[in-house]
Design a protein with these regions (language model features):
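Asp/Glu-centered strand-loop micro-motifs enriched in Gly/Pro and often flanked by an aromatic residue
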Residues: 53-57, 181-190, 320-322, 620, ...
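Extracellular/periplasmic, surface-exposed regions of secreted and cell-surface proteins
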Residues: 63, 98, 104-113, 118-123, ...
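Extracytoplasmic gating/loop element in the C-terminal half of outer-membrane beta-barrel translocons
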Residues: 38-43, 53, 233-236, 355, ...
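Glycine-rich, aromatic-lined ligand/substrate-binding cores of catalytic
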Residues: 635-668
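Conserved small-residue
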Residues: 1-46, 297, 411, 519-634
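Transmembrane beta-barrel wall of Gram-negative outer-membrane proteins
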Residues: 54-129, 140, 145-150, 193-198
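Residues embedded in well-ordered regular secondary structure
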Residues: 1-93, 130-133, 161-170, 181-186, ...
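A generic structural motif
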Residues: 86-90, 354-356, 518, 636-638, ...
Length: 794
């Protein structure tokens, strides 16, 4: 997305759109437009032509350092590491700094007893604009405010002053939307501490039997503080301040803590019987987890001095809020592995999970699974193929189920509230105001586990001493009792009904992997690829007729179709010629007659003119309206995913490249900043739209004519705004060199390697947004990184 940065062009384009919607031109001073154009960038402070993308994003240098040590004796071993990370971010005031450490210790106290401890943690600090919504200075808000500016605004002068409007005819709301000013209008810090510890005892009282018990604890503490930074926005043509953010100031403090406890006991037994022909590997265990969180937030207004970073530095009203939550999980599980001569493999699993998120009668879910594999390459009748290069040939069959309890901690319970959108539920009693409560959500005692049942049939193969390897799998994955919101009958009043286990979704497809590895002298290389195809279908919802459709904008959930399919009008063409316009008149002439009167076929969206979109009459009733919508795409979930991993080494030189992509995914994306032929006074306009728009005399336009943003004629939900999310990314290219050992030993090093890499540098896609992986979100895309590093081993 590249915005129009020539301000003279921008003003004329805005005028064009408003006039074509029958509205007055916002920029009436034609002399100023010509004055701006004539300057041609000679005086960038007085006559700016700003590209907000270039001004907002910057290159930065990030650091990541890790030192690790390991050692010990025959009975005691340790590993420790220390790390430091510093990333200043690609936007101002969005930096991140992190210190981390790890210590693992393992001790053989007795021949039958091992004790181990693993402790890790980090301390991080984040600049406030990376997260806070105070003063509109979050990263995501940067895009929102940057879109609501114009190229006629200086973002920041060389002397550090921020720009506002340089043209009084610009929209006044643009004056306070300078994204650089927004990023720097908040001060504070986000400080986070995380400590994880795990203590393990392993007993081996007799051969083949192992008993392991562990206890884990994680502690997270996040402290946030924010206060405003008062800044001014300047009109550099007249050298006056036209904007200041000195509104009602506030200071905020937040503290949130999380405690997570986990403990488990697992017994394992392994043996071989009947002359080692029968192998038995059994496991039985239990685990328990508890999560607890609480937070507190306080805000106070009217700061005496913004340099005072404490709540008592403000003298106005104060507000405070807090919340807490907890959930727990208990599991019992077992597994038995059997093999006969390591040719026939059988595995049986059973687990029972209990979740505190469900009521007692629905708390436990049982999830069994089993798999069988047959190693054909070990059969005698395969000797001929083994002689011809067959190394591995395994057939696999499995069936199993898993549970999902990803619901709110208290969704099974009734919810009471003291207010709703219409106000508080207080009432008068004896001339006094009493606090009132009303039921906001009905309880659902039947809420229970969402279950996924999966069948898999596969084959593994290897040829030529496993230089060529591959797998082929067919999977059938059905998720039942999916939690959805169903409409509430009017008898429930204002109370909403809870989520219910009412839907089923089927995913089925194939997964393929293929790899080749070889060595020719000092040259080694490998090529590994993967491919996945998935078909998605809602198999149970609210019925197959249109009354069972749930709408979410352009996306729908409809039984018998892919989840989040796009349900849209189909665009026939952009009306650009007299022949195109004749089709409009033909529909008017042939319109149906109802009660003796000819129906206006375009009443729903307006009669299209040259430069407008013409939609298709899908149901052939002679009328263009919302009844002409149909499913035009299976939605944003990709049908195809693929990847390729290349590795090569020659003596001390090593090379690696990772490619990844997807296809068969589409989104409905209509964004005035990116791909809509709409103009709005004080807002940006995409250059691609401006260059591709229709205007009188043009017959090869790729976008409709410009219209004022509230004019909906060319903004109906249609497949014109359906974007393909297919892409191929070269995720990483790395080249390294390891010095010969004879050189590193001279400087007391065991190994010394230099490397450089390019990360997220190459993306091939037709998607017009920032990044097909984040779809239509105008948010922080994946950054391109150039990395240089050194690996040292002593």
């Amino acid at each position: 997305m590249d915005p129009v940065s020539n301000y003279a062009d921008y003003m004329e384009l805005i005028n064009e759109g408003y006039e074509q919607s029958g509205m007055a031109k916002p920029f009436k001073d034609q002399a100023l437009i010509e004055e701006w154009r004539a300057d041609a960038g000679k005086n960038p402070l007085k006559y700016p032509n700003t590209n907000w993308l270039e001004e907002t994003f910057k290159s930065s240098v990030a650091h990541n350092h890790v030192i690790s040590m390991n050692g010990g004796s025959e009975k005691i071993k340790f590993y420790s590491s220390f790390g430091y990370q510093n990333n200043p971010g690609v936007m101002e005031n969005t930096g991140f700094e992190k210190y981390n450490a790890r210590l693992n210790v393992s001790a053989d106290v007795k021949k039958w007893l091992n004790l181990a401890a693993q402790v890790s943690g980090y301390v991080s600090n984040m600049d406030p604009a990376a997260k806070y919504q105070s003063e509109g200075s979050t990263v995501s808000d940067v895009f929102k405010f940057a879109s609501a500016t114009t190229p006629g605004m200086v973002f920041r002068a060389p002397d550090g002053r921020y720009g506002a409007m340089n043209n009084s005819e610009d929209s006044s709301q643009s004056a306070n939307n300078n994204p650089l000013l927004r990023l720097n209008s908040v001060d504070g810090n986000i400080h986070k501490t995380n400590v994880r510890s795990r203590f393990i005892a392993t007993l081996k009282p007799f051969k083949g039997f192992t008993l392991t018990g562990s206890y884990s604890y994680e502690f997270v503490d996040e402290e946030r503080s924010s206060k405003p930074v008062f800044l001014e926005g300047w009109d550099f043509r007249n050298e006056i301040v036209t904007f200041t953010n000195k509104k009602k100031s506030s200071i905020m403090n937040y503290d949130g803590k999380i405690d997570r406890f986990f403990n488990d006991v697992v017994a394992r037994y392994e043996t071989r019987l009947i002359n080692d022909a029968l192998g038995i590997n059994a496991m039985l265990g239990a685990s328990q987890e508890k999560y607890r969180s609480h937070n507190f937030k306080a805000t106070k207004y009217d700061m005496i001095d913004t340099s005072l970073g404490v709540l008592n530095g403000a003298i106005g009203d104060a507000s405070a809020s807090g919340s807490s939550a907890e959930w727990a999980m208990r599991s019992f599980f077992g597994r038995v592995n059997l093999d006969w001569q390591q040719k026939y493999l059988l595995e049986i699993n059973l687990r029972a999970d209990q979740s505190s998120r469900f009521l007692k009668s629905k708390r436990t879910g049982y999830f069994p699974s089993a798999s069988f594999a047959w190693r054909l390459e070990q059969e005698k009748f395969m000797e001929g193929l083994r002689d011809k290069g067959l190394s591995t040939l395994k057939l696999r069959l499995s069936y199993g189920s898993l549970g999902n309890n990803a619901v709110g901690n208290y969704d099974a319970l009734a919810l009471y509230a003291n207010k709703n959108d219409d106000g508080a539920f207080n009432y008068s009693l004896n001339n006094l105001v009493a606090l009132g409560l009303a039921q906001a959500r009905i309880a659902n005692p039947n809420l229970t586990w969402e279950s996924t049942y999966m069948t898999n049939v596969g084959i593994d193969f290897g040829l030529f001493n496993n230089r060529l390897t591959g797998t082929m799998d067919y999977f059938h994955k059905k998720t039942k009792d999916i939690l959805i919101n169903l409409p509430a009958p009017a008898v429930h009043g204002i109370a909403s009904i809870p989520k219910q286990n009412s839907a089923e979704v089927l995913n089925q497809g194939v997964e393929l992997t293929l790899g080749w590895q070889d060595k020719i002298g000092d040259f080694s290389y490998s090529v590994n690829g993967n491919f996945t195809y998935v078909k998605n279908e809602v198999t149970k919802y609210k019925g197959k007729d249109k009354g069972g459709i749930t709408y979410s904008g352009a996306n729908i959930i409809w039984e018998g179709h892919a989840i989040n399919s796009q349900y849209l009008l189909r665009c026939d063409r952009i009306i650009q010629t007299d022949e195109d316009l004749a089709l409009v008149q033909q529909m008017i002439d042939n319109a149906p007659v109802v009660d003796g009167k000819k129906v206006d076929p375009f009443a729903a969206f307006g009669t299209p003119q040259k430069g407008d979109l013409l939609y298709k009459d899908i149901n052939q009733d002679g009328i263009i309206d919302m009844d002409d919508r149909e499913i035009v795409s299976d939605g944003p979930n990709p049908k195809f995913q693929f990847g390729l991993n290349l590795n090569a080494s020659y003596k001390g030189i090593d090379f690696a490249m990772l490619l990844q992509g997807q296809a068969g995914a589409k989104i409905y994306w209509q964004n005035d900043l990116a791909n809509t032929p709409s103009v709005r006074h004080g807002y940006q306009l995409n250059k691609e739209v401006a260059d591709g728009r229709w205007y009188e005399g043009r017959t090869d336009a790729t976008y409709p004519r410009l219209l004022e943003y509230q004019d909906q004629r060319n903004k109906q939900m249609s497949d014109f705004y359906l974007e393909n999310l297919a892409y191929l990314k070269i995720r990483n290219i790395q080249l390294g060199y390891t010095l010969p050992a004879k050189l590193t030993k001279k400087i007391s090093l065991e190994r010394l390697r230099f490397y450089g890499s390019l990360e997220n540098f190459f993306t091939f896609t037709s998607f017009r947004g920032f990044d097909p992986e984040i779809g239509g979100n105008i948010d922080y895309p994946a950054m391109k990184n150039v990395v240089f590093g050194i690996n040292l081993s002593f």
